[in-house]
Design a protein with these regions (language model features):
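Alpha-helix/helix-capping structural signal
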Residues: 17, 126-127, 199
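Ligand-binding pocket segment of bilobal, Venus flytrap-like solute-binding proteins
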Residues: 72, 77-79, 83-154
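An extracytoplasmic/periplasmic, membrane-proximal ligand-sensing/linker region
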Residues: 92-94, 181-241
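Conserved functional loop/turn residues at catalytic and ligand-binding sites
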Residues: 5, 58, 116-117, 136, ...
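Hinge/capping helix and adjacent helix->loop/strand transition within the periplasmic-binding protein
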Residues: 3-9, 22-108, 159, 170-203
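C-terminal lobe and pocket-closing loops
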Residues: 127-196, 225-228
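Short, Asp-centered acidic motifs that coordinate Mg2+ and/or phosphate
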Residues: 8-12, 47, 119-120, 139
């Protein structure tokens, strides 16, 4: 998307992993390397999951257990990825410390937790849903301001008395940096109108996500805030290493 002609025919649809790749040094560009388009989808249904027989089933219970057993609880992550930053955010907010184990992708985390190789995993609810319905896993909750519109039965960390918020996956569009303003505006107008369509909104909900339109300016502001948080978390993690 950075190389093609800025004529509106090449567009990237991505999420905040774009920022993490830059913060961790995987890439030399961030959102600033693009013309930021509108934001359209939020997946805030990402949280921690444990086995049904774990000695904790809420965030307060987990925090108490971790403080009584510092460094003993194993957390499966993908080092340098979205879930890694999520875990570091939880540690910073609560003062606990996990024994981090790099187990790979979302599906790999489920396999590791099911096999008893880790104690907890951070993951999307949509990935863990089948294991929750079978009674194998328990969802501790989401680090969001409000309950998910898609999974309203899952509590937030906040309502459990834990002051922990962490942005979920924020999906939006990115255009080549030098895309003319009139093309950007035309694209934004078309997307904004599309996001008002009830069928489109329902299709997004059916995928386990929430339809959340933000203008390019508001999305860029959100990305700047998220990147600043990632930079702080990554710096703290490296300082402690």
């Amino acid at each position: 998307v950075q190389e093609p002609a800025p004529d509106g025919n090449t567009i990237l649809f991505f999420h905040n992993a774009l920022l993490i790749n830059n913060v961790t040094g995987v890439s030399d560009y961030s959102y600033e390397g693009f013309a930021v388009g509108p934001h359209v989808v939020t997946d805030n249904a990402t949280g921690f999951y444990v086995s049904a027989d774990a000695p904790y089933s809420t965030y307060p219970e987990l925090i108490d257990y971790c403080k009584e057993h510092p460094g003993e609880v194993t957390m499966g992550v993908e080092v340098g990825g979205f879930t890694y930053m999520m875990v570091k955010s939880f540690e910073a907010a609560t003062g606990v410390q996990f024994n981090l184990v790099d187990v790979g992708s979302h599906s790999d985390k489920c396999t590791a937790l099911l096999g008893g190789h880790i104690d907890i995993m951070p993951n999307q609810y949509s990935t863990a849903k089948g294991y929750i319905e079978s009674g194998d896993f328990v969802a501790l909750g989401f680090p969001a301001e409000e309950r998910s519109a898609v999974y309203p039965d899952v509590p937030t960390a906040k309502e459990q008395g834990v002051d922990w918020l962490y942005n979920g996956y924020e999906f939006g569009f990115f255009l080549p940096k030098d895309t003319p303003k009139d093309i950007q505006d035309t694209f934004d107008t078309a997307v904004a109108e599309l996001m008002e369509d009830e069928e489109v909104q329902q299709a997004i909900l059916d995928l386990g996500n929430e339809p959340t339109y933000l203008s390019p300016a508001d999305y860029e502001s959100q990305l700047a805030d998220i990147q600043a948080e990632y930079e702080e978390l990554w710096a703290a993690a490296n300082a402690a290493a």
